[in-house]
Amino acid sequence: VASRDAHRPNLLVVLTDDQGPWAMGHRNRDLVTPAIGELVAGGTELDRFFCASPVCSPARASLLTGRMPSAHGVHDWIRGEAYGVRDEDSYLACLTTTPEVLATAGYECGHSGKWHLGTSRHPAPGFTSWYAHRTGDGRYVGAPVWRDGRAEDEPRYLTEAITDEAVAFLEANGANDRPFYLQVNYTAPHSPWVDQHPARYTEVYDGATFDSCPREEPHPWFSWEPGPVSDAMTDPVPSLLGYFASLTAVDAGVRRLLDLLDATGARESTCVVYTSDNGFSCGHHGIWGKGNGTWPLNMWENSVRVPFVVSFPGRIAAGRVDSGLTSACDLHPTLLDLAGVAVPEDPLAAGRSVLPRLLGEETGGDEAVVVFDEYGGTRMARTAQWKYVVRRDGPEELYDLVNDPDERENRSGEQGSAIRRDELAGVLHDWFARHNAAERDAFARPVSGRGQVSPLWRGRSDAETYASAAGERHAAAPAVSRRRPP
């Protein structure tokens, strides 16, 4: 398949949707994902890798551009046609993305699965192969997709359909000596979870009680709203079954892709990346959800930290764990560096290539490194030990992650922590001042976690740009079951 040159490698990026850092087979005794486990064993894991925003669309935009949301302008999940938006815009217009740069450098670029960055009716710039979900979530059978510009309901189980189309791309490029870039964007393990997945995946978990996931009292910030997350909080086992089964289905897809690369002799010249757009909590911290699973929006570790594994036989060490802090904004320059392609000049770029770390030429243990996150009016700065969160309108937070890894004790109001808090507040302020485009910034705008309906570059009013302001996001909490089946 395509390039056999390890110095101009093929690039395969597998991106899941809402996969918490705890939801990896080598960290979770309940999860069955042997193929992904082989990637971990055969590659290098960056185990403190952080999304740029703990929600789908802005996180994905940062992966593709190397910019933070305040510089690319995507600040909430994009509502799209599923929520009444017709004639969707392109949210990345005028921005340079990874596939665009690679295509210019001679790569064949393919996309299979979730896009969620505005219109997906036709291929985004840089792509020649395109199979795209029409929205950002929804059912796994009969899923809305675009096929050759026509809206269709996919008759196949969606996770397998995404794999099928990725396999078709690899097979179609088998006689092509150009290197490829293929992003396989699964919607799993995103909701809905119950009665969505074939028995061949759910039966793996027959009798499972999923004790690896906590049953905590609901957090006071948890958003009790009708739907999958509130159902999961009241009775978690059926939803946990779907969440875990969906990842086992992803694992089956990863197995098919790796087997095809092996069969065609391209595995040694293909760098495989496995990661997720943002994290997720399945009962952790007393919520089901990610950054918008609470009001105020949260920056807890399970929301902002995601799995990240790179496997490239012969170039990147097997079985190694790098615990340096790494940002999702680093993926864009790292992939270009791997391809031997110059990273375009961008004064607002927030990422840097971590290829030297992946090759073992540098370590990631610099205690001075800080990673940043943002979601509308909520921003985070995190060092190896401390996490500081500031909100335009809401509580300030400071956590000592060494002594309080579960983020239970907010020390922002302690006199003894004032120096640390003020130091991180200054670092955060100065950093965002350098990585910010005023016309794309939303710190002072009403981002509520209910979605974005228009790109900021259109210059429309807040009411025309964002779904309804947060308002009262807490309904009455129903009774919560802590039961586990016998």
Task: State what each model feature region is.
Residues 125-126, 167, 384:
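Short, structured coil segments at secondary-structure junctions
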Residues 12, 16, 36-41, 64, ...:
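Non-transmembrane alpha-helical segments in soluble domains
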Residues 3-9, 16-31, 54, 134-161, ...:
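Active-site-proximal cap/lid insertion segments
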Residues 13-16, 20-110, 129, 135-136, ...:
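Active-site segment of extracytoplasmic enzymes that catalyze sulfate/phosphate-ester chemistry
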Residues 33-34, 63, 114, 123, ...:
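Polar, surface-exposed loop/tail segments
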Residues 312, 381-384, 391, 401:
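Active-site beta-strand termini and strand-to-loop segments that position acidic
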Residues 25-32, 44-67, 75, 111-122, ...:
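Short, solvent-exposed turn/loop segments enriched in Gly/Ser/Thr/Pro and often Arg
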Residues 404:
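Intrinsically disordered, low-complexity polar regions and short flexible loop motifs
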